[in-house]
Structures are given as C-alpha cells and as structure tokens.
Amino acid sequence: MAINKQQLVKDYEEAFGRNAALPIAFWHSDTPIAKPEKIGGSFIPVLEDVRCGYPVSLDAETMLCGGGKCYCGLAPLPAYVPTFVSEKEHYKASAELVEKAISHMDIQVSPYRYINFQRLDLMDEGIDYYGVLIFASPDVLSGLVSWAYYDNASQDAVAVPWGSGCSATIRAVIRENELMGRQCFIGFFDPTVRPNVNKNELMFAIPKSRLEEMAEYIRDTCLFNGKAWQKVRERINPE
C-alpha cells in the first residue's frame, strides 16, 4: 500500500507535536540531491543538518569513515574493521565475534553511487526510499514504540541490534525493507556515536515496508485515543 506522505506527516505532527523531530528518509541514487561535501570521521552529525531541513548526499569519496561507507552500501567492509572493533574499541571479545555479528547484517554494496538523506516532509513524491530515521527522546520513543507494537504481536517488533550507529539503523532498515519485513529498530547506543548526537536522544528507524502499515493505523493508536499519551505529549511540548 502506497503511503500518503502528506497525510502521514500531518498525522505525525499532530500525534507528537512541534518539538518532536520529523522523520528523515534515505535512499540510493545515481544523482545526488545536494552537492556532496567531504566528511572526516562519523557522518552522523550531518543528520542534524537534515533534521533542520537541508538535504544531504554522500558517496564513497566524500564519506571517509570506512564503517559508514560499508553500512551505507557505498563500499565493501574494510578488512581492518573486525580487529579494530575488538582490539581498539573493545566492543566484542574477539574479531571472530565481530565477523559473526556483521555476517547477520548481510551487507551489500549498492549499484548506485550516492546515498541521500532528506526530511520526509520535504522529499519529492515518487522517490523509492528505504525507510525513515527519527531522532527521539525517551518520551518520543514511548510513542513510537507504542505505535510500532499496535498491530504487531511479535515480541521483537522493535529490536535493538548490536553495531555502530549507522549499522543498527541505516543498514538494518535497508535489509528489513528488502525482506518486506515488519521490524523497527532503536539505535545510537554505540558509545562511539554518542558524542555526535544529543545526550537525551536515540534513533528510531522504520523500514518503508513497515511504515506503510503503521501509517494506516496511526490514528487508531493511543497517540490519538485515551488520556495516557496526552500527558506525555504535553511534556514533549510544554507551553
């Protein structure tokens, strides 16, 4: 079912209020939507620009983070990553464990050159995007998780994958959307990414395959019915 983007954005803003960050869509293409600029280190800080309304495009030449290139589908996984994650960052007990964890991500290099990020409300109609990323405080997460579980009885309808900020959100969404899956993800627990985001925010990620379903039911959920969510919404949007 195709998403009525304008209606979804309207419903989202009504449900969460003006202080909640709007969803960021992302997709690959052969043509950038903005001039790519070189970024050293993590590219996650540029998502703050996207949140503010600016489109961003990156390719393998402008994204210098080896892991970021890989998890965004712009280049193969660098050979040093498993050892680096284990022996330098100490996030896994061994390089073999890192390799095993990464194997579950089924990483593929996109045939397209660029990865693009743009706020959903500003994106052109007809773009085949992978899903959305939402910067979320604990209160906003409460609403997003409640929304995601509304029509899904699975205990892992919302998952917290191990990995870097981009692997646990961007790569997870790409793969889930390819599988036409129903799982959403919470990311940005990785200590390496934390200094690059607001201290009271994580990232909620929804594949388009799931967003199409969630958009249909949003007005039936607690976000529009009952009194509990309204108290949380008021705290997100104080007078």
Describe each model-derived feature in a short phrase.
Residues 3-239:
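Acidic, serine/proline-rich low-complexity intrinsically disordered regions
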